[in-house]
Amino acid sequence: MSETAPAAPAAPAPVEKTPVKKKAKKTGAAAGKRKASGPPVSELITKAVAASKERSGVSLAALKKALAAAGYDVEKNNSRIKLGLKSLVSKGTLVQTKGTGASGSFKLNKKAASGEAKPKAKKAGAAKAKKPAGAAKKPKKATGAATPKKTAKKTPKKAKKPAAAAGAKKVSKSPKKVKAAKPKKAAKSPAKAKAPKAKASKPKASKPKATKAKKAAPRKK
């Protein structure tokens, strides 16, 4: 029985492990809050460079002072500041006037800043253009309602036109047949009348020839 008694203290061991897991969760949540709460380093650097009025540009030491004044931990995030400067220079948002790498002085690229402002203005213009387009859709519905009226009026007109055209065709065909038959008969009759006149003229020309021959015969005797 004495051997079974020491087995009981094994139960509090897992109880001690559970708070360790809770602490790990808390630290992870706190780290997430820290990351979400502060803006990225690149934004802070661009703001600090834009706020400076130096023509030659802002040095790294001046940047660190401006970031420390804004509440950013410069000592812990020194490497992040240098990486942020390099990335901004590679993107074209910052121009390095002096030095190489992260050490030197930096200025804002005016062309990149103006390029970022232009697309925003275009988006605003597109949003304004969309509003009148939506207002113009309302009168289109009214025109669509008016179209069936026009089609209803056109259908009886189409039915009347073929009937009138058929009547006109029938009327025009009947006088053409009457006119074509009359001149043909009239043309044939004068042709027949001219033929006997030509036959009558031929014997008249032959008669004087016979008389002349008879008169000449007694002279030969």
Curated annotation (Swiss-Prot):
Instruction: Cite the SUPFAM superfamilies for this sequence.
Output: Winged helix' DNA-binding domain
Q: How is it modified after translation?
A: H1 histones are progressively phosphorylated during the cell cycle, becoming maximally phosphorylated during late G2 phase and M phase, and being dephosphorylated sharply thereafter. Hydroxybutyrylation of histones is induced by starvation.
The record, for CDD domains, names: H15
UniProt keyword annotation of Acetylation present? yes
- Region entry Disordered, spans: 1-42, 92-221
Q: Where on the chain is Citrulline found, per UniProt?
A: 55
Q: Which UniProt keywords apply?
A: Acetylation, Chromosome, Citrullination, DNA-binding, Hydroxylation, Nucleus, Phosphoprotein
Where is it localised?
A: Nucleus; Chromosome
Which GO terms fall under biological process for this protein?
A: chromatin organization; negative regulation of transcription by RNA polymerase II; nucleosome assembly; regulation of transcription by RNA polymerase II
Where are the compositionally biased (Basic residues) regions? 20-36, 120-141, 150-161, 170-187, 194-221
| Pfam families reported in the protein's UniProt record | Linker_histone
| Gene3D superfamilies, per database record | Winged helix-like DNA-binding domain superfamily/Winged helix DNA-binding domain (1.10.10.10)
Indicate where the modification N6-(beta-hydroxybutyryl)lysine is found in the sequence: 33, 35, 53, 65, 86, 91, 107, 141
* Modification sites for Phosphoserine: 2, 105
Residues annotated as domain H15: 37-110
Q: Cellular component terms, GO, for this chain's entry?
A: euchromatin; nucleosome; nucleus
In this UniProt entry, the residues modified to N6-acetyllysine are: 17
Q: Which PROSITE patterns match?
A: H15
Please give the function described in this protein's UniProt entry: Histone H1 protein binds to linker DNA between nucleosomes forming the macromolecular structure known as the chromatin fiber. Histones H1 are necessary for the condensation of nucleosome chains into higher-order structured fibers. Also acts as a regulator of individual gene transcription through chromatin remodeling, nucleosome spacing and DNA methylation.
The family assignment reads: Belongs to the histone H1/H5 family.
Q: How does the entry describe the domains?
A: The C-terminal domain is required for high-affinity binding to chromatin.
What is the name of this protein? Histone H1.3
Naturally occurring in which organism (per UniProt):
Mus musculus
**Lineage of producing organism:** Eukaryota, Metazoa, Chordata, Craniata, Vertebrata
